[in-house]
Regions:
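Nucleic-acid processing machinery
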Residues: 1-153
Length: 153
């Protein structure tokens, strides 16, 4: 029941939730920057977005629930190991230890890539809105945007 409330809240307050979303993103960034211990060879970038009303409707028309109205992508690069995929799990564990997550929505596309070779971890956190967090390294991100996994569906 609580989950339905958050999902409905996301749908109804897509634009009203912008300040809340931005505040949550700042909290996540600050926590990762100040509390997560990682090597100097790793740099982290963040991309956030709010799904457009058109994309929400398209997803509903495909008979899917739009859990990902609010999204944050965490992209890291390890200058010593460009293929470092283990750091994604460190970030995921850190997020899971600091936020309320919905385990049954968790997807591990790093260990189990999609057919189109898409790789990323998807974690969903509940604040007063539901936020999808995608965690991937820069090579995975390049493939998602420009490579074999660049198709949207």
């Amino acid at each position: 029941m609580l989950f339905c409330y958050f999902l409905l809240n996301n749908l109804l307050n897509r634009f009203n939730g912008l300040n809340t979303f931005n505040n949550n993103i700042l909290v996540i960034k600050e926590l990762i920057t100040n509390k997560l211990v990682y090597k100097n060879s790793i740099s982290i970038n963040y991309n956030s977005r709010i799904k457009s009303q058109k994309r929400i409707i398209q997803k509903i028309n495909r008979l899917r629930i739009p859990y990902d109205i609010y999204g944050l992508r965490i992209i890291y690069e390890d200058s010593l190991d460009m293929n470092n995929s283990q750091f994604a799990y460190i970030i995921k564990d850190f997020i899971c230890n600091n936020f309320y997550t919905i385990d049954y929505l968790y997807d591990d596309y790093i260990k189990y890539p999609k057919i189109n070779k898409y790789q990323s971890l998807h974690v969903y956190i509940i604040t007063n809105i539901l936020i999808e967090i995608q965690i991937r390294n820069s090579l995975m991100n390049f493939n998602a945007i420009n490579g074999t996994a660049s198709n949207y569906y």
